[in-house]
């Protein structure tokens, strides 16, 4: 998740070879896109690219955008992508957290990725006080991606819950759906 043009689609493409449209324009992403990401420890996770946040959205669009952001309710971790060279970065971060709170997912673990380090140079490391972890990355060049994947795997392992579930025979299709999502790429 993150503000518009922060690099969310570029990150999804870098991590999963998703091939989603990644352009520097408003509303390049209009629908959530989910892909399988294989972590270094061989775990597989589902990664979803969402529509970008924007302040002062016209009221007739607010509900439509919130419906696409509902994906966050099903997430184990929120990956917050921030444009680290945007002059209004602090307000953008605040807008994202306001929306997460409105969606009632503000209590989920957050990894904040300060993206576009290839453009930021040697700027000091920034910290997101609400995030479980903050790091600098470049979705374009791959800088910091390995460290991010290690941290993501670590946080997922810390929060892993094992569930044994019995399904009725007529609901067996759900098991196949879950397997397809997790084991195909």
Language-model regions, residue ranges each:
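Conserved G1/Walker A P-loop phosphate-binding module
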Residues: 1-55
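Flexible beta-alpha connector loops of hexameric P-loop NTPases
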Residues: 19, 52-61, 85-88
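Active-site glycine-centered loops adjacent to acidic/histidine catalytic or metal-binding residues
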Residues: 49, 115, 138
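Catalytic P-loop NTP-binding/switch module of NTPases
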Residues: 61-69
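Conserved C-terminal guanine-recognition region of P-loop GTPase G domains, centered on the G4
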Residues: 69-78, 82-133
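Canonical P-loop GTPase G-domain recognition
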Residues: 118-162
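Short, surface-exposed ligand-recognition loops at beta-strand->loop->(often short) alpha-helix junctions
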Residues: 166-171
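Conserved small/polar residues in nucleotide/adenosyl-binding loops
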Residues: 183-184
């Amino acid at each position: 998740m993150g503000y518009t043009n922060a690099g969310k689609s570029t990150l999804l493409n870098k991590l999963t070879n998703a091939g989603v449209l990644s352009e520097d324009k408003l509303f390049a992403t209009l629908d959530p896109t989910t892909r399988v990401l294989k972590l270094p420890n061989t775990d597989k996770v589902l990664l979803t690219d969402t529509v970008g946040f924007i302040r002062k959205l016209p009221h007739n669009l607010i509900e439509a955008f919130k419906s696409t952001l509902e994906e966050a309710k099903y997430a184990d971790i929120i990956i917050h992508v921030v444009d680290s060279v945007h002059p209004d970065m602090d307000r953008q971060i605040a807008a994202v957290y306001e929306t997460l709170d409105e969606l009632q997912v503000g209590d989920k673990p957050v990894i904040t990725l300060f993206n576009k380090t290839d453009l930021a140079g040697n700027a000091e490391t920034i910290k997101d006080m609400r995030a479980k972890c903050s790091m600098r990355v470049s979705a374009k060049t791959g800088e910091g991606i390995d460290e991010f994947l290690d941290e993501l795997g670590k946080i997922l392992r810390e929060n892993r819950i094992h569930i044994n579930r019995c399904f009725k025979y007529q609901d067996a299709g759900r098991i196949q759906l879950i397997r397809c999502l997790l084991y195909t790429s």
